[in-house]
Amino acid sequence: MENQFLMSTSVTQRLQALRDEIQFLGLNAWLVTSADPHLSEHLPEHWMFLRYLSGFTGSYGCMVITADRALLWTDSRYWEQAARQLEGSGIELMRFGAEGVPNARQWLCENLPENAQVGCDPLTISENDFRRFEIAFSERGMILTGYISVTDHVWKGRPHPDVAPISVFTNTQESVARKLEKVRKAVHAAGADSLLLGTLEDIAWLTNLRGSDIACTPVFTSYLLVTDEDVTLYVDPTKIQTADVKKHLKTNSISVVAYSDRRAHIAQHLNGHRVLLDADAVNHAVYALLEQESSAYVVAGERPTALLKSRKNKAELELLKETMRQDGAALCEFFARLDEMLWDGEMPTEQELAEMLHAERAKRKGFVCDSFPAIVAFGANAALPHYN
C-alpha cells in the first residue's frame, strides 16, 4: 500500500500540487485531517490523503500546509515513527500533547495574518471540529471554508472506493425491527422525528449487515436515514449482490438509494422533519447540506445507536466470553509453536510471526478478520507502539 502511494511522485511534488490549488483558490492555508466522510478511526485507501501527502503511515494525524511551510501533528504513539518517515521531506513534526506545542488551531491563529482564509475538505471534518476552528478564527477575522474537489485535483492515481459485497450478519441476538423500535423511541425523546447516521459501525449494527470496505473492520460505506415512516440505506447498489441481502432488506423494509445520489435525496426527504444529528459523528458537509438545501430542522444530540449497541444482553456477553476463550487458545497455540521454532534454532521474521498468529486465529470457529494487523516487533522496532 505504501509503495502505491509514494512511488509515482515525491512528497515535495505532492505538496507543491496542493500549494498550487491553495493559491488558485486564494487561500492562506489548507487543513488536512486523517478522516473519511464517516469519520472512521481506520480509513479505506481512497481516503488516506494525509498519508499520500506526507508519507506518514500512522493512523492519527493532521496537517497544515501554507505557501512556505508544512506541519504534521500526531500523538506520542507515533512521534518516533513520524520523525523517521518525515525526515528529509521538509514537513515539520509537531508533537501533539508535548509541553509548549500548539495544536493546529492555535498555530494557525498565531501564524496567519488577520482575515486569513483557510480551506479544508468538509467531508473529512466533524461539524463540532469545524465549529471549534470557526470560534478560534473569529477573534482574528479568519475564515474556514470547505472545498470538496481539492483532494481529487491533487491526488493523481487516487485509489478507487471499494465495492466489496455486503453480507447478512446471522449471529445477531436482536432483530432489526427491535433495534429500530429502540432507536425511534430515543429519537422521539430527543425531540426529533428522524435520525441520520454516518458512522459505519452504527449502520452495520442497526441493519445487521456487514461489509469489508475497511481493513480489519466489517463495515460498508453508507449512510442511513431513519424516520417514523421508513428506513433508507444510501449505498453503492453493486454491493448488494446476494439473494440473502436482498431478502433481508425487503423483510426489514429498508429502501436503497445509490450512495452517489444521497445528497439530493437526503435534502428532499428531510424537508419539514426534525432530524437528530450527532455533531461529533457527522461531517460538516452533511450539516451544511441540511442547513442550506433543506427545510429540515436539525436537533443536535448524541446518536442513540452509540449507547444502544454498547449494552450487551446475556447471549451477547456469552459470545464475547467465547471469543476471548477462542482467542486465548489461538495465542497458546501460537506461543507453543514459537517455542518449538526457537528450540530448533529457527529465527522467524516479524512478518512470519504475524502471519502465524493470523493463521492460528483464522482456524477458530466464527473467525471473520483480525481486529487490527498484528504488532510484532524485534529490537529497535519494539520502541514503536504501533509498529507494523
Placement of each model-derived feature along the sequence:
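Conserved catalytic alpha/beta cores of large enzymes that bind or transform nucleotide phosphates
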Residues: 108-109, 116, 120, 244-311, ...
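Active-site-proximal beta-alpha loop/turn segments in soluble metabolic enzymes
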Residues: 160-169, 312-316, 336-346, 383
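Terminal amphipathic helices with adjacent charged low-complexity linkers/tails
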Residues: 132-157, 283-319
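Generic, well-ordered alpha-helical scaffold segments in large soluble proteins
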Residues: 18-21, 111, 136, 186, ...
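N-terminal accessory/capping or targeting/presequence segment of soluble
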Residues: 2-113, 125, 129-269, 330, ...
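Conserved short loop/turn motifs at secondary-structure junctions
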Residues: 3-8, 119-126, 171-172, 202, ...
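Hydrophobic/aromatic-rich, well-ordered segments within soluble, folded domains that form packed cores
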Residues: 56, 65, 313-324
